[in-house]
Amino acid sequence: MHSRKSKSITGKRKQVGSNVTRVIKPQKTRRIIRRFHHLINKRQSICKFLCLKENLDDSNEEKNDKIIRLSIKGNVRLGKYYEDGKSQSFNDAMESQLLRLHSLIKNESKSKDTSDLAVMYTLLGYIMNQINKLGGLETYQIASQNGQLKERGGDTSKLLEKWIRSSFENCPGAVALEIGSLSSGNRISRCALFRNVVRIDLEEHEGVIKQDFMERPLPRNENDKFDLISCSLVLNFVKNHRDRGAMCHRMVKFLKPQGYIFIVLPQACVTHSRYCDKTLLQNLLGSIGLIMLNSHQSNKLYYCLYQLQVVPPQPSSFSKRIKVNDGPGLNNFGITL
């Protein structure tokens, strides 16, 4: 008789102790990745507000729980709020508070009284429980890797190869940087156009270095720069419009003269945003020296390829968000420089 534990997360039965690769259904992968990033970002904001002495480790939730408990050691009341949050299943009230977290932190940053701490530790407990129910880092990594499988249509670099092949076929020494890499087996790594592909991500995978691009040391010389930078489904996870702009600026610093940047965004970022559309994005990137060579919009994604100009870029007029659309149901994705 099969136990419940002998099932994989897809519901298929699996031998206990086997090395069978767990597979997540394609319709679930993007939802899991998005949910994981949402929870991690909210947790980081709360921990920064609470000034925890030790940074959390997204790969070790048991350790994280101990760090949080240590921060409230001796405070029975805050411990109770934390446990209360951990006991709550998914609910609209808590999700609503997470969506309003930035405003909550802004309003409470001056006081940090007992009621403020109670709210934050309750939310922190809720997030910890949600991450645990999601399956933690292991499930996130499986979802990420499944999303890159060729048979699931998840490799966004297939279109990139088509666009750049003629430019790189006769450049044997070309090097590329893939930000937010999910797999060492995607097209950018297998197309044989690059002497070396440096793959980085916030989480370590096989063939992928654990590194935050914003903390990567700046190039010391041209040899440290890249002919191509791929930034696929990364900018949309950066927490605010200013940080997205800072990331765009930083990518330019890593490019060789006339180097290329490949950007992929969820389609909604340029079709259903109050502060961004395809024209604004093109003009904004143009202001930092990037000209668009190709673009493509699918049912769910927007792909674009830019090249660094030789001429100096124009002064930026994108220091504030510009409303380009208005109405219900729009998101607030935007980029400022």
UniProtKB/Swiss-Prot annotation:
Gene3D superfamilies: Vaccinia Virus protein VP39
Catalysed transformations (reactions): adenosine(2142) in 25S rRNA + S-adenosyl-L-methionine = N(1)-methyladenosine(2142) in 25S rRNA + S-adenosyl-L-homocysteine + H(+)
Free-text disruption phenotype from the record: Loss of N(1)-methyladenine(2142) in 25S rRNA. Confers anisomycin and peroxide sensitivity to the cells as well as slight defects in ribosome subunit joining.
Effect of G180R: Abolishes methyltransferase activity
Leader peptide range in chain numbering: none
Keyword Lipid biosynthesis: no
Subcellular location: Nucleus, Nucleolus
UniProt xrefs under InterPro entries: Bmt2/SAMTOR, SAM-dependent_MTases_sf
Binding-site list for S-adenosyl-L-methionine: G180, D201
EC number: 2.1.1.286
GO molecular function: rRNA (adenine) methyltransferase activity; S-adenosylmethionine-dependent methyltransferase activity
Bilayer-crossing regions: none
Key words of the record: Methyltransferase, Nucleus, S-adenosyl-L-methionine, Transferase
Superkingdom of this protein's organism: Eukaryota
Family: Belongs to the BMT2 family.
Other facts noted in the record for this chain: Present with 623 molecules/cell in log phase SD medium.
Protein's recorded name: 25S rRNA (adenine(2142)-N(1))-methyltransferase
Taxonomic path: Eukaryota, Fungi, Dikarya, Ascomycota, Saccharomycotina
